[in-house]
């Protein structure tokens, strides 16, 4: 994520892992303004649609809250249809002159699907049930994939909470815009 100026808040790590009937989204708590840490305990994960959807954002905070509100209204118009609501949001985000300027990405999940939504109009379902966004996203993604795809006996017995916490901790040790104050939300069927 490019840091254009010191007046915009950037940098975070959001990680989503789905296994079986459980999905967890985790985010770190750091908010940076330029090269300065402003807050260590921000909550970047939110529940929507009567707690049936969880979402996390990376990017400018005010922009993300605008997108949360828009997504919530799309979910009200299309209850129980997360994919359709996300596609409608992405279309608006790409076409609307005001929304096009928003600088954020989102991971959204319900009991059956996980999606990444970008301002380019992309709605992507990740492979292998693992998705990550933000400045530390690639580190968290690599760590989560390594933990999930290992074939040894230990990895098969790891809980999703352990995997996501470990992957986020690894990302926080590499990315200067990510801390180890991890907040998680989960949906379990």
From Swiss-Prot:
CDD domains: protease_HslV. Disulfide bonds: none annotated. A double ring-shaped homohexamer of HslV is capped on each side by a ring-shaped HslU homohexamer. The assembly of the HslU/HslV complex is dependent on binding of ATP. One of its GO terms (biological process) is proteolysis involved in protein catabolic process. NCBIfam families: ATP_dep_HslV, PRK05456.1. The active site is at residue 12. It catalyses: ATP-dependent cleavage of peptide bonds with broad specificity. Na(+) binds at residues 172, 175, 178. One of its GO terms (molecular function) is metal ion binding. Gene3D superfamilies: Glutamine Phosphoribosylpyrophosphate, subunit 1, domain 1. Protease subunit of a proteasome-like degradation complex believed to be a general protein degrading machinery. Its main location: cytoplasm. The keyword Cytoplasm applies. SUPFAM superfamilies: N-terminal nucleophile aminohydrolases (Ntn hydrolases). It is found in: Cytoplasm. It holds the Pfam family Proteasome. The gene is hslV. It comes from Ehrlichia chaffeensis (strain ATCC CRL-10679 / Arkansas). Its EC number is 3.4.25.2. This is ATP-dependent protease subunit HslV. Keywords: Allosteric enzyme, Cytoplasm, Hydrolase, Metal-binding, Protease, Sodium, Threonine protease. Allosterically activated by HslU binding.
